[in-house]
Amino acid sequence: MHNTLLFELGTEELPARFIPGLIKQLEENSANLLTEYRIEYENIKVMATPRRLTLLVNGLADKQQSSTTMKRGPAKEIAFDENGEPTKAAIGFARGQNIDPKDLEIREDNGKEYVYAVAEIVGENCQDVLPKLLDELITKFNLPVKMFWNNKQDKFLRPVRWLVCLFNDQVLPLNFGTVEASNISRGHRFLSQGDVIINSAENYEEVMRDSWVMVDHNVREETIKAQIEELADQMNASPEMPHDLLEEVNFLVEWPTALLGNFAEEFLEIPKEALITSMQEHQKYFALVDKEDSSKLLPYFVAVRNGDDHGIDKVKAGNERVLRARLSDARFFFEEDTKTSLESKREQLKSIIYKEQLGSVDQKVTRMEELGKTLLDILELSEPVRSLTLRAIALSKADLPTNMVSEFPHLQGIMGEKYARIHGEDEKVCLGISEHYLPRHTGDKLPQTMVGTITSIVDKVDNIASSFAIGERPSGSQDPYALRRQALGIVHIILETELAFSLEQLFHRALSLIPESALVAPISNILDDILDFVKLRSRTIFNEQGLPIDIIDSTLEVDKANVYKAYLRAKVLKDYRDSQELEDVRTAYTRVKNLANKAKGEDVYTELLQDETEKMLYHKYLNTEDKLLSDLEQDEISSAISELAGFKDYIDQFFDEVMVMVDDKHLQNNRLNLIYHIKEMYRQLADFSIIQD
């Protein structure tokens, strides 16, 4: 198994943002097809540049693996007559399988005998099979967009200009539209001499490197990182190197060469976030910050060119000239924005539509203010947090109409903080404005102030409630308003801040603030859907924290709205999983649950309690429930478990000595209702029937 397959699809420049997805498809589809075609191999390597997608398969077998197929036919008694001769059914089946009836085999299946057509498929030479496999591989690309060329006969993400297909040193017959496969590739668009002959699949990467192409994107990325870090070290700096930018730059070049540029220090008067964003989004540059103080932006940048260092000084000067124009624009935006306060910009929110059915962003902020008051009341937060929070909410969206945010939307909140500080707002208000968008993505930091925490929660609650209210909810992989991420953010914030409150009350308030004409269903129905939606996010996060799914479900089943309480209870229940106490609780709960389902859930009438055992059970229930509720109120979960475990003996004695299903319906219903209330007492903590052994 020393064969090597090379498949290179050469194109015009591919959009950088789509290349990672194409790499993943090529890896997965090629592996699946090789398995489907029964071709053994050692490893697959997929590589990509802006102008090519490459598949390299090493250690290919000479031949496909042979296989045996079995096709079941009619039952034996139908296939053969009493003399053992094949019937028309057997003959017809054999003909359909292209075998002689005498070659049919009899095998047993689920205790019954059938005839089978058994055939061995001999493996073909891989060299003969691979063209068909690769032709199928080409058709499997799921393209985000398509271009057509050659009178619309051919289509791909970008026009295909060459095709290399080698099995060792032999060209395999293959075509993509009108492009025929050969052993001729192309080197770097500007540095190479054009056509590159690949004499052997094994030497592909080496030959391409000699033609100024680093085909392996992983090697290319490491090269870019090393070059950037080396230049940054020269300035005693650290590069701002977000993965998305590094990945995009990587797929813009075939031969990277990094260069160090600078800009006038006067631009450092602009908030660094605006400068960095301008460099990254417009120019694909890497900003540099002080190695000792990452909050200090330095007047330097690193750019990566697609070429060598020839004429690098001219390239540097050109990059600096372009950046100077960009930063001048940013300075103009900043100066214009700071001429008026954030408060004065609130009026402009009336002309920005939030959602057509729900009016303007100003109306959204008004709803947020009402939600903020509700949450502040629930949490019993007083001054100065109350007034500072409501101020932060009022100004939270006021930076949306600014020039800077209009140019760079992802700076929303960040610029609001800067502008609020310039115009003398309280520091907690400034931070609350920027923090209310947190977390912006998975793994992002959370709000660090209570003002930011409350503002963030009410913003996300309004976003989720308003979207569900008008029927814009996530479905499948579609989540255009990032509602799943926002629900996850709410749960993360609640767990981080240990805020124990019911989301049901807050979401109900949010829905009540939406015009009735915009609602697609009754509020109660929408509320249930929202709480179930948040419950799934809670379930995910609890599990990521190491809690077992069954224990998570047991607590969320009885209270999906109080996220922190459910988490605390699940955390303690996990520690009790193998304890005798939890086993006693589960056993007792199972006994009462089965009968409780027959109860009407009415009050227990003490005058109908006749047996001393049931009287004792009832009084113990009242006593235990009082202690249980007190324990749960103070988050004394261990004590609550002990209370319920100690209740088991009373339940056992009751079932041993008292007949529940007596003929007297009044007595029967009263006893069933007692059992029902005991079950509900247990459910104050969890649904113990969900917890597995």
From Swiss-Prot:
KW Nucleus (keyword) present: no
UniProt keyword Manganese present: no
GO biological process, one term: glycyl-tRNA aminoacylation
EC number annotated for this UniProt entry: 6.1.1.14
Catalytic activity: tRNA(Gly) + glycine + ATP = glycyl-tRNA(Gly) + AMP + diphosphate
Keyword terms of this UniProt record: Aminoacyl-tRNA synthetase, ATP-binding, Cytoplasm, Ligase, Nucleotide-binding, Protein biosynthesis
GO cellular component: cytosol
Subcellular location: Cytoplasm
GO MF annotations in UniProt: arginine-tRNA ligase activity; ATP binding; glycine-tRNA ligase activity
One Pfam family linked to the record: tRNA_synt_2f
Similarity comment: family membership: Belongs to the class-II aminoacyl-tRNA synthetase family.
PANTHER family: GLYCINE--TRNA LIGASE, CHLOROPLASTIC_MITOCHONDRIAL 2, GLYCYL-TRNA SYNTHETASE
Subunit field text: Tetramer of two alpha and two beta subunits.
Protein name per UniProt: Glycine--tRNA ligase beta subunit
Organism: Natranaerobius thermophilus (strain ATCC BAA-1301 / DSM 18059 / JW/NM-WN-LF)
Lineage per the UniProt record: Bacteria, Bacillati, Bacillota, Clostridia, Natranaerobiales
